[in-house]
Every structure is written in C-alpha cells, then in structure tokens.
Amino acid sequence: MSNWLVDKLIPSIMRSETQKSSVPEGLWHKCPSCEAVLYRPELEKTLDVCPKCHHHMRIDARTRLDIFLDADGREEIAAELEPVDRLKFRDSKKYKDRLSAAQKQTGEKDALIAMSGKVLNVPVVACAFEFSFMGGSMGAIVGERFVRAANVALEKRCPLVCFSASGGARMQEALISLMQMAKTSAVLARMREEGLPFISVLTDPVYGGVSASLAMLGDVIVAEPKALIGFAGPRVIEQTVREKLPEGFQRSEFLLEHGAIDLIIPRAELRSRLARLLAQMQKLPTPVETSQVTAKA
C-alpha cells in the first residue's frame, strides 16, 4: 500500500473510533422472556412490564412503593436499622463484605423497606423486599423492620401490605435468620386478633423461609402474573423426587388453579384494585381512582 494511502486512511479510522457517538448506558433493555429490545423510557411508562409479551420484570423496592403509595404523606419506618455481622460468618466471602457490596449496589441498608402512607387516600402501611440485596434474604433487620411496620399498622389501626421478592432466610445469620419466621408470623397473628387486614403480594420470585412464613399468611394472597413461588426451586425438587414436574409448576397461575393463592393482578392494576380491596375489607367508601404513577414519577 502506498504511503499516501496509509497516511490518508489511518488518521480517518482513528478519528472515527474516537468520535463514535456515545449511547447512554441502560437506554435499551432486552426482555428476558421474549427477548424484544425495549427503549428504557418507554418501558418505565409500562411499569417495567414488556409491552410485547407482558412479562413482569423485577423492580426495586423503592420503585415498588413509589408505584403503590400516594406521593404525599409517606413516612419510612425503621430506616435507621442496619445489619450487624454478629456471628463473624464467612463462606467464600466475609458476611460483612457481602453486606457492603449489597449496600453499595442497591443504595439500601438491607433487603426490606417499610413505609406508612396512603393508597388512593386509604391509610396503609406497606413493605417491599429488595431482591437485589442478597436475593431479598430475610435476616434480623428485615424481620425487625417488618415487625415494626406491623406495629405501626396496629397503632394506626390500618392494614398492612407486603410485596415479597425473596430467596428465603439469610444463611449468613444462621438461627438468627430462622427466628424471623416465627417473629413475623407472631406479629401477623396479633394483627389478625385485632381484625386488621394483611394483604400479601407475591412477586417474582418468593422462596424459602419467606414463602414459609409471612408471604403465605395474608388474609388475601395476591400474585403478579407468572411469578415463581415455592419453598425449594423446581430443579431441586426434580432432583429429589426424580420426576418431571408439571408444566408451569410454581408459577402463580398454577398456584391460583390449585387454590394456594387468591388473585393474580397485573402490575398496572395493583394500586387501584388493592385500594378497593382494602376499603372493602374495612367497610370504607370506595376510593376514587387516580392516574397510575409511573416507575419514575
């Protein structure tokens, strides 16, 4: 190749490499179900539900509460509580290092957020699990925040709603995490004695100690479409029983068909339908529907 051609082409190639237009990170998202490539701002308008196949994608706990609660009058409960590595637990990593990494990734102190507020002007206390924080696992702080949220509901004489998304008990806290199953179940028994409603909303996924305790103790148990719900995962069960499981086993539709849950409600309808349900359970006037907030209000 002649020198003049090299001199001409090389600078041109280098300029094109350095001058490539930069696309903001996270602008496009691939649906994990149908693999459609979706424009992130448009996806936010549908509350992270794929407009092509209606797959309900996982959303973080704060977005979940932003979608559900009225904008005014929210108050976070027990936000000051932080997990402590009392057992000095270590597997492939130190527990305190796992906590630090999860806190940095999510911006949360632990895997449950609780708030008091209103939904369509109906007073409520709401909790949401943060699955990105160590798989939404339930340790001492998750259990304590849930109990404090229930106590606020008892004090205010209002219902409790919990959006679960969890892999179960947090193994790094050993028996301390298992205690939370009894602890959360006990406070829900108090709510039942006081005649205060508890609605459990199961989102993808709900497993282990959470599904074996608070998640399945709702006066009404609701799930999002196609959420995975169970105690052990399908693969573990298949390996144990050495049989092929039925189609759709552990999906919310399968559980509804077999009477394990009461309702399946699409995400876009959760706010209005739960508000009406809460009002009916307390014999309050039917709430007036307002426009559904988006994930990024």
Curated annotation (Swiss-Prot):
Pathway: Lipid metabolism; malonyl-CoA biosynthesis; malonyl-CoA from acetyl-CoA: step 1/1. It comes from the Bacteria. Its EC number is 2.1.3.15. Binds 1 zinc ion per subunit. GO terms for cellular component: acetate CoA-transferase complex. Pfam families: Carboxyl_trans, Zn_ribbon_ACC. HAMAP family: AcetylCoA_CT_beta. This is Acetyl-coenzyme A carboxylase carboxyl transferase subunit beta. It comes from Stutzerimonas stutzeri (strain A1501).
